[in-house]
Amino acid sequence: MKQAMTPEEIKEKKPYLDWSLSEHEYDYICDHLLHRLPNYTEIGLFSAMWSEHCSYKKSKPVLKLFPTKGKRVVQGPGEGAGVVDIDDGQAVVFKAESHNHPTTVEPYQGAATGVGGILRDVFSMGARPVAILDSLHFGELKDNPTMRYKMEETIKGVGDYGNCMGIPNLGGETTFDPCYNGNILLNAMNVGIMDIKDMEHGDATGVGNAVMYVGAKTGRDGIHGATFASADFSEEHATQRSAVQVGDPFMEKLLMEACLELILHHREWLVGIQDMGAAGIVSSSAEMATEGKSGMDLNLNLVPQREPNMSAYEIMLSESQERMLLCVKKGHEEDVKKIFDEYNLDAVTIGRITDDGRYVLHHDDQVVCDIPVVTLTEKVLEEKSEEKKPQRIIDVEQSENWQPEIEDAGQTLRALLNQPTIANDQFVTQQYDSQVRTDTIVGPGSDSGILRVRHTKKAIAMTTDTNGRFVYLDPKVGGQRTVLESATNIVASGALPLAITDCLNYGDPNDPEIFWELHQSCQGIADACEILETPVVSGNVSLYNENNGKAIYPSPMIGMVGLIKNYDHVIPMHMQTAGDKIYLVGKTDDDFAGSELQKMMTGKISGLPHAPNLPGIKDYLYKLQKLMAEGLVQSAHDLSEGGLGVSLAESVFDTDLGVNVKLDFNKNLLFSETPGRLIVSVAPENAAKFEQEMGDAVSEIGQVTDDKQLNISLTNDQVNEDVAKLQKIWKECIPCLMKSKA
């Protein structure tokens, strides 16, 4: 690396502007925090730690809206992952993270390292990762070979990393929209299980205790990855692959086993542990010291390096993967080293804990950093962003909502099943191992993935849900509906919703309209979480998701987990037995704004999606879950994209069954996307009790048949379709698009 600038040259040439640090922030650091000019290494550390990706300096006021406490919450936001009590001294540990910019630039490695990073967040808590989910959002595939390539590589990256780790992928979601053409989204969620007594924290305390670096060696990959994720994205970034990390899942597997052995069997040696994620060593070390109200003194020459002549700046800001930082009690360094030696991993003491609150770095016999550690973590200048309601929303509030003109309901259903967001995503999920570890009860393709908790009768349900169209049209309502969609998916599987994690994917927060979208949608998420009793226990913020000034739809992703106390009561999504009665749960209205139907018929979205009656929906959803636990429900499937028509078809795919349904509404409403609805099937002998308990929240609409036909009678149309032909359309959509020559 060329000779670093002097502090005076930094002041004059302002290289920090390229690292997402403003001139105002630089002056504040000089005048109010350090009372001197920072050197090259120090300003690099400030740039990374004060980036939006690490500090949440713009989004923090909005994040304070979220409810984070609940009777089952053991650990909320602030640690590696959220921890939620699932009874019997056990907890589910989970978190979601975005890796959008790296995946857009280098799809395979961006996706793979996105999975790797979220695994480390979970096992650093003392939990064994048991499941991966992913929320993938691509541009249109048709006439877009670049997007098809990016999709293939992204899926391969997710699959290869998870498969090599031996952790099942239970699905998630895959959507397609032109707004993601220049900036795809990769949100990965990891779920782990642990005994609550084994929970670890990211603390660094105790003067003289060792700071130990464990795992893979440090290289030059990923330098300034945090600031890369905190700036506008443009065509220039298409070649910025040095900011993308390179993953090694086999190394991660060894690291996971070594860390879990240390935590579970020798925790008396350990004070704290944290993943080296965004901003690498500086982030993990500074955060651990701050959490422990301590100082830290590190010798960077002791850091294991895989490349020669690395500068202090490069060592500290590298985001090389498969690395952890430990705080180990003095005198147990060799004990810890022996564990990692058994796994062929580096384990090196690179520094000590101090009590002066200073963050001191040595390199090549020079002190290259000596600053108060809190200046990196707690003295960040929070930025108050301007907000402005977009004119498009003001205009639409004064206009009538779009209503479809459907000629043939059957033809419309066939066309919807051929939309890639609705179509079968087996092209994606078949590349994942969903059965490894042999605990999977329900894998990809259902409303929720479900995994049994070993040595118990319990099961954990999990889902990821995003709908940027609704949030774009009405951010607050869209936020509510996204959380509700997750809760409906969890209940459809027979589980009680417990808590959520999130990935908040938005454009440039310096745009007042985009910040307004962020604020309003987070308010909607908070409102829904409060009412549904699903606190936010972890998550992340990913801003600047734009390409050449064009932002994605505001796309908050909700990852939710639920508890099934007896896995004998897991509810399948497919109809089970001919003769069972079919019920529609929830009321249907003409809700087409942002729907798949609207996009398909008009090529655009418009209008205002309807606000859900959250208290009323919560009442019947949770009542339904209790009846499921009592064995009164045979199957259940939520209604989302494509509405009732699509869900009825999906409920008999891969079966020898059909449905005969009579509806008291018109053909338009067959494809309405009113939220909070499900279709359930109930055995005739349980129907009376089911109806009595559910009351007017349900209406009987038909029965399951054995003729493999989808028969739907409407007030102004009739659908008579062969299930096998519908399924063929649904299954072939994405493979056909991927094989396209255009």
UniProtKB/Swiss-Prot annotation:
GO BP annotations listed: 'de novo' IMP biosynthetic process
Pfam family, one: AIRS_C
Main location: cytoplasm
Binding site for Mg(2+) 2: D121, D275
Keyword Cytoplasm: yes
GO MF assignments: ATP binding; magnesium ion binding; phosphoribosylformylglycinamidine synthase activity
Catalytic residues as annotated in Swiss-Prot or TrEMBL: H53, H99 (proton acceptor)
Binding sites annotated in the UniProt record for Mg(2+) 1: E97, N540
Keyword DNA repair: no
Example of a GO cellular component annotation carried by this entry: cytoplasm
Function: Part of the phosphoribosylformylglycinamidine synthase complex involved in the purines biosynthetic pathway. Catalyzes the ATP-dependent conversion of formylglycinamide ribonucleotide (FGAR) and glutamine to yield formylglycinamidine ribonucleotide (FGAM) and glutamate. The FGAM synthase complex is composed of three subunits. PurQ produces an ammonia molecule by converting glutamine to glutamate. PurL transfers the ammonia molecule to FGAR to form FGAM in an ATP-dependent manner.
The protein's assembly and partners: Monomer. Part of the FGAM synthase complex composed of 1 PurL, 1 PurQ and 2 PurS subunits.
Family of this protein: Belongs to the FGAMS family.
PANTHER family associated with the record: PHOSPHORIBOSYLFORMYLGLYCINAMIDINE SYNTHASE SUBUNIT PURL
Record NCBIfam families: FGAM_synth_II, PRK01213.1
The name this protein goes by in its record: Phosphoribosylformylglycinamidine synthase subunit PurL
